[in-house]
Amino acid sequence: MKNVVLLGATGSIGTSSVDVILQHSDIFKLYAVAANSSVAKVAEIVRKFKVERVCMFDPNAAKELEKELGMKVLAGMEGLCELAADPKADIIINALMGAVGCLPTITAIEHGKHVALANKETMVMAGPVIWDKLAENPKSFITPIDSEHSAIFQCLSGRPEKEVEFLEITASGGPFREWPIEKFESITVADALNHPVWSMGKKITIDSASMMNKGLEVLEAHFLFHIPYEQIKVVVHPQSMVHSLVQFRDGSLMAQLGAPDMRIPIQVALTWPDRLPLETKRLDLPTLAKLTFFEPDFNKFRCLALAFEAGRRGGIVPAMMNAANEVLVDAFLKGNLKFTDIPKHVETIMTGAPTVTGHLTLDQVLEADDEARRLTSALIK
C-alpha cells in the first residue's frame, strides 16, 4: 500500500486523482490532502477516505476546517512543504496551480519522494534548480501528469535523448483557433473560458485560450526530457486525441492516443511502468472520422512565441514571464484588462528582465517571481 499526498485536492486534476485512487484502493491510500480554501470539499474528502493529514493554504480556511473536523489542519506554504516531506508519504501528487507549487516540489525531491507532477510552473520557473535537486537526491524521481508530457514520457520509455530528433507537442488551439486576429480586442472572459475540449480551472483555461499554456508546456518538456528548444515543436490538433509525438532519428514517429480524460495520465504517473485497469472511455478508431493537424499561428498567439523566447533566454526570464502571466490572467478574469493586454504586458516584463549568468539558484528564482509580480501589478494599476 502506497501513501499518497494530494496537493491541490479540489481542482480538476485533484478530483480526477481522487477517482483514480478510489479505483485502486487496494494499492493506494489517500494519506494527506491540501487545498486553497474549499473547506466543504476538503471535509468531504477527509471523511470519505479517512485522510490522516490536511493543509489549507488559506489560514482562515485552515481554522474553519479544524473546527469542522476536530483535527489539526496545517496552513500556508509551510504546511504544504510539511506534507511534501512527510516520512510516511510515498507519492506526492502536485496538482497545485501556479508558482505556489514550486517549493513543495523541491521539498518532496529533497526528501526522496516520487513526485507525480501536474504543476508545470515548477519546471518553468526553476527547471535548472530541479535538475540539481534530482541529481543530489537519486531516490527521488518525477513522473509527469500533463497529458502532453505523459504522452512523450510513454513514447520515450526511457530511451536516451540522443535518439530523439524532435518532440511534437499537440495543442487543441483553444476557442480562438479560427477567430481572426482583428476580433481579439473584443474577447470576453466568457469567450475565453469556453474551451472546446477540456474541462479545467479558470486560470489554465485562459492560458489555453492565449496558448500560454502550450508555451509553458514547451519549457516543461525541455526540462523534463533534456531536449533543446530547437528540437521541440507545437502542432495544433483540434480533436485532442493524439496527446503528443516523438520523432526518432531512425525515422520512426511515435504517438500516444487516448480519450481526453486526465485520469489516464494521472494513473500512468502513479503506476508506471505497470498498466492497471481503468474505467474510462476507449477510443474507437473507425468512429474518429479524421484527425487534423495545423501549424500554430505565432502572430495571433503571441504568448506561445514569448514562451519560446523565454526558454531560449533562460535564467530568470521564464520565472518572470510566468509570474507576469499569473497576475495578468487574474486581472483579466476580474475584468480589469483586455485579453490582448496579456501578451503585451508579458512582453514588457520580459524585455526588462535582467540576464543572469552562472548557476541559477532557488533564491534568484523566488526573487524574480516576486519582482515580476510587483512590476506587473504596477503596470496595470
Describe every region a protein language model picked out.
Residues 1-381:
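Catalytic, metal-anchored helix/loop core of enzyme active sites in primary metabolism
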